[in-house]
Amino acid sequence: MKKRHLLSLLALGISTACYGETYPAPIGPSQSDFGGVGLLQTPTARMAREGELSLNYRDNDQYRYYSASVQLFPWLETTLRYTDVRTRQYSSVEAFSGDQTYKDKAFDLKLRLWEESYWLPQVAVGARDIGGTGLFDAEYLVASKAWGPFDFTLGLGWGYLGTSGNVKNPLCSASDKYCYRDNSYKQAGSIDGSQMFHGPASLFGGVEYQTPWQPLRLKLEYEGNNYQQDFAGKLEQKSKFNVGAIYRVTDWADVNLSYERGNTFMFGVTLRTNFNDLRPSYNDNARPQYQPQPQDAILQHSVVANQLTLLKYNAGLADPQIQAKGDTLYVTGEQVKYRDSREGIIRANRIVMNDLPDGIKTIRITENRLNMPQVTTETDVASLKNHLAGEPLGHETTLAQKRVEPVVPQSTEQGWYIDKSRFDFHIDPVLNQSVGGPENFYMYQLGVMGTADLWLTDHLLTTGSLFANLANNYDKFNYTNPPQDSHLPRVRTHVREYVQNDVYVNNLQANYFQHLGNGFYGQVYGGYLETMFGGAGAEVLYRPLDSNWAFGLDANYVKQRDWRSAKDMMKFTDYSVKTGHLTAYWTPSFAQDVLVKASVGQYLAGDKGGTLEIAKRFDSGVVVGGYATITNVSKEEYGEGDFTKGVYVSVPLDLFSSGPTRSRAAIGWTPLTRDGGQQLGRKFQLYDMTSDRSVNFR
């Protein structure tokens, strides 16, 4: 009887430990040493919240891991990583890389196959070091199941995760080819799926425990790597069990300490934010109160002057115009203040409703961009009046408002406007960065860019920008020779010579913009179009209003700018090329926050092919995207990297500014700059200039 009571008490204690309220809910998945949600050396099937960005640093005697992990979708995790191999030099040539240690770059993906249920675990499949050198490449299938404060994981790994070979590769039963894996190191940037899930396989697993003290979590794992093939050298492994602790300092920071291989300490830090949760915190003028004043059919000059001022400074409409025609009031202007133009429409409607001319039944607000009309928002006055005055509870109606093709009436006697500013000048800070170079891991250039715009007519714009260097560490550049593994024209690999000039004209050009009607827009341009090329070109875009697709075509003839000095950059070399692309834009109906962009055409090196770009927009307006270009240039002719690819993050500056703004800043990462698959960097692209024609993607 006593034994039975003892077992009952033990079972009750376990049940209480697993389900009692003394154990708080886990505060979210944690990052592994390699970046991405996991235990220590091994991954789990868990995913972070959609939009989560984690910046990670881990350090031990042999390696430093720098990684950035983004949860693009609830089912897809992406990770970029640089591994500093502390025991190896970048190269054996001191004049080339000095005493810098070897840096290996990698890209990882993890895909959730299904979510956890009451009985079934969450399951994911993933791959590490895709398109890298193969130093740390691995594939895995992993399952995770929570039980109270414990989260258990069991997985099967190949490659770096499976070198101990503690189980037979199950795929060997399908074909003997899966029993062998080529472990020779590959050329960086090459994507070779032929070795995936090949070679020795190992089981791995572990548990993460949420302690009663919520900031603290403990980890225990069993790993399948034997460290006998590590690039840092054969590493002693006294134990296959690793233990660690993670402490959440704040909502946005974790610190980590672990003891791995039975002989090595690892420590690190994780900084995080969520792109879906970021919100602007600027101070802004309040929306105008609805205080209607009776007006005659023709507005008084003092009244309309006040309206125009409010439209410009409160509603954010630059160059505002007001015009009455029949029973319709027309308002036009360019939204330069609010990223979400709906806010500007709300404010503009209130402004004109407070002093609405007698007899007006409809308000039409047309938004312009670069003097090209984009969209007209048409609102019924009676419906708007009811909404602004307030409707009885239970009797609310839908505002009678719709977006239509831009309507711009001919000038009448009842028209008022604020004179357009034909000239604009501004200075912006510029930070150019390069990560992973041979001379220094981090290269930077801090400078300022002065930009001047002058409208010669309503459609003809002249614009130029001058860059001035303030500080950089480009004195470390000591290698500007052409790539030895490629014979393509050097359309981009002269970048080091260009940026070493302290002052240079970045661009100087003339643009003619025209709204062609029925969803068509066009531009022609000529001059110094970007840092490395000048010439002339044209673009036409067909973008139906609020459609989830669009098509564009651009054609250009350009010559390469000289790079030898700032003065020589105003001259051209003998190299010229015709370049242009047919581009399709698509926002899937099942994923309104995703933009797919596909281009085909001829690139700057004369190669022909296509580019696929996919971008995800989060609730905050942050956009994360990636692209890849394949052309008719062979891998051997292209050189290291095989093809052009990269990722970028575009951040709306109103998340950090003291006031609303439509400006954005972009950060890009390209594993390696080569000459194949390179597009012309045009300052104005019509799809970006017509973003107000879409209610979904801005």
Curated annotation (Swiss-Prot):
<comment type="similarity">
    <text>To E.coli YmcA.</text>
</comment>
<feature type="lipid moiety-binding region" description="S-diacylglycerol cysteine">
    <location>
        <position position="18"/>
    </location>
</feature>
<protein>
    <recommendedName>
        <fullName>Uncharacterized lipoprotein YjbH</fullName>
    </recommendedName>
</protein>
<keyword id="KW-1003">Cell membrane</keyword>
<keyword id="KW-0564">Palmitate</keyword>
<feature type="lipid moiety-binding region" description="N-palmitoyl cysteine">
    <location>
        <position position="18"/>
    </location>
</feature>
<keyword id="KW-0449">Lipoprotein</keyword>
<feature type="signal peptide">
    <location>
        <begin position="1"/>
        <end position="17"/>
    </location>
</feature>
<dbReference type="Pfam" id="PF06082">
    <property type="entry name" value="YjbH"/>
</dbReference>
<keyword id="KW-0472">Membrane</keyword>
<dbReference type="InterPro" id="IPR010344">
    <property type="entry name" value="YbjH"/>
</dbReference>
<dbReference type="GO" id="GO:0005886">
    <property type="term" value="C:plasma membrane"/>
</dbReference>
<keyword id="KW-0732">Signal</keyword>
